[in-house]
């Protein structure tokens, strides 16, 4: 591979930008839509067990978010370094980046598996008031679910890294296959393992977790296969996974801010659960349902985001200013359009969305208000997400971190806390649009600085 120094330029530097962005993003958007559908269907089946089971899965969300943050953030660092190295024709460095990414995921998996074994019950007990009559049931459900998800988390973590490698080299079609197959397997296995269909044992919430990890492991296996057989830009081998400090440092210069940025979401969900729990466990369940529903809107935008990062990074390495600007403009237009559709759906039929999860009258009362208020920030979020992906592609991980901290920690939790104590439960949801207005304003300021510092100077 390395002897091909005269190879044809990657399509990310030559294909028309609109066509390239659609080509790069559509497979990931489609696969993430399937992934979002799985998230929704999974929770629908869990809600049929009981509202306590649904609450338990909602309370597990912060740790699952943290796990995704570590895998996704490291993947962002690998993606940016790999794409930039390919754009600069530094093929040996690109190869090393891919192998270090795989090694880092193996190490991260061990840490989460250990927490799954020893820390799961304590994590749920920290969120549930022991005096509640259903506290033991929620903790039991949650511990069973989270232990399985973490002990077998090597599937999702390695899958995410391998998919980032495929994305960075323009092989996005294969990421659609891996994510799609994994999600479909999960959806098929959910009712079978939860309710004991087709001769399978009735596992309840443990069945939901088992279906999840089986789907993830199958997706990981496909991602390994595609990287070995279809990806000629990099070569994965255990012999090449000897730690390389400079490469790991380059990965985490972008990756650690991205990890922290996504982990902030974990802190936010944990904090919101603590703010909502004194009102009722139903309010916590509503918050969890909102995140499942919003994934169907946000996941396609994240798929678009994953397509944008390697395109901008590659063209930054190749010093192609106009292609970078076209990518950003077109990305924002698509993102805001998707978010507008999502906002309209949430405003029009919140009750029908909630009834998918077997919502009780109390859940409907709380949830209809929550969905209609929260969705008002969707279009603003669409702009912020694209700007954050731009910062990441330029290696400006700190800028992404600052924006994420503003929208998911610095503003939203204090706002939610104050609104809860002054105005009550229904006012809490206004913290989302308040935080988004602040973060988008700050994002615009940072982007103007980035433009004058890096983009404007390109040929």
Regions found by a protein language model. Name each.
Residues 1-25, 82-154, 201-256, 312-377, ...:
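Short alpha-helical transmembrane segments in multi-pass integral membrane proteins
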Residues 23, 46-65, 136-141, 205-206, ...:
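Interfacial/gating helices of multi-pass transporter permease domains
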Residues 23-42, 148, 182, 215-219, ...:
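Transmembrane helical elements of multi-pass membrane transporters/channels
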Residues 30, 42-46, 57, 82, ...:
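Hydrophobic/aromatic residues within transmembrane alpha-helices of membrane transport systems
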Residues 33, 37-55, 124-136, 192-203, ...:
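Helix-terminus/linker motif at the lipid-water interface of multi-pass membrane proteins
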Residues 54-114, 156-175, 286-344, 348, ...:
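Small-residue-rich hydrophobic transmembrane alpha-helices
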Residues 66-69, 186-191, 220-224, 296-299, ...:
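Hydrophobic transmembrane alpha-helices of multi-pass small-molecule transporters
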Residues 75, 149-167, 175-183, 208-221, ...:
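Short runs within selected transmembrane alpha-helices of multi-pass transporters and secretion channels
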């Amino acid at each position: 591979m390395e002897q091909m120094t005269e190879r044809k330029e990657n399509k990310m530097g030559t294909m028309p930008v609109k066509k390239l962005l659609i080509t790069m993003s559509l497979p990931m958007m489609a696969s993430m839509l399937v992934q979002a559908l799985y998230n929704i269907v999974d929770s629908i089946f869990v809600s049929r067990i009981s509202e306590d089971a649904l609450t338990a899965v909602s309370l597990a969300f912060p740790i699952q978010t943290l796990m995704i943050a570590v895998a996704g953030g490291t993947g962002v660092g690998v993606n940016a370094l790999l794409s930039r190295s390919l754009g600069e024709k530094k093929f040996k460095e690109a190869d090393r980046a891919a192998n270090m990414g795989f090694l880092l995921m193996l190490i991260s998996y061990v840490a989460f598996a250990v927490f799954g074994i020893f820390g799961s019950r304590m994590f749920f007990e920290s969120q549930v008031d022991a005096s509640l009559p259903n506290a033991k049931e929620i903790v039991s459900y949650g511990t069973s679910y989270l232990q399985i998800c973490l002990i077998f988390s090597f599937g999702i973590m390695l899958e995410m890294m391998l998919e980032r490698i495929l994305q960075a080299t323009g092989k996005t079609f294969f990421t659609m296959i891996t994510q799609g197959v994994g999600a479909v397997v999960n959806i098929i296995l959910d009712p079978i393992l939860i309710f004991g269909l087709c001769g399978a044992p009735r596992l309840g919430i443990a069945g939901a977790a088992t279906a999840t990890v089986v789907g993830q492991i199958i997706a990981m296996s496909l991602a390994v296969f595609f990287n070995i057989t279809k990806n000629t830009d990099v070569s994965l081998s255990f012999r090449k996974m000897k730690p390389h400090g400079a490469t790991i440092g380059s990965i985490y210069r972008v990756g650690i801010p991205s990890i922290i940025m996504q982990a902030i979401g974990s802190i936010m969900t944990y904090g919101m659960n603590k703010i909502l729990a004194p009102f009722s466990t139903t309010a916590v369940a509503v918050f969890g349902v909102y995140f499942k529903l919003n994934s169907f809107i946000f996941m396609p935008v994240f798929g678009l985001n994953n397509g944008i990062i390697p395109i901008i990074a590659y063209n930054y390495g190749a010093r192609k200013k106009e292609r970078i600007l076209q990518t950003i403009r077109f990305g924002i237009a698509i993102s805001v359009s998707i978010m507008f559709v999502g906002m309209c759906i949430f405003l029009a039929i919140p009750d029908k969305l909630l009834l998918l999860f077997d919502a009780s009258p109390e859940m409907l009362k709380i949830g209809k208000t929550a969905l209609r208020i929260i969705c008002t920030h969707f279009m603003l979020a669409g702009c912020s997400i694209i700007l954050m992906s731009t910062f990441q592609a330029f290696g400006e991980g700190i800028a992404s971190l600052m924006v994420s901290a503003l929208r998911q920690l610095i503003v939203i939790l204090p706002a939610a806390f104050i609104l809860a104590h002054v105005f009550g439960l229904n006012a809490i949801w206004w913290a989302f649009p308040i935080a988004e207005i602040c973060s988008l304003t700050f994002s615009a300021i940072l982007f103007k600085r980035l433009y004058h510092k890096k983009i404007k100077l390109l040929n």
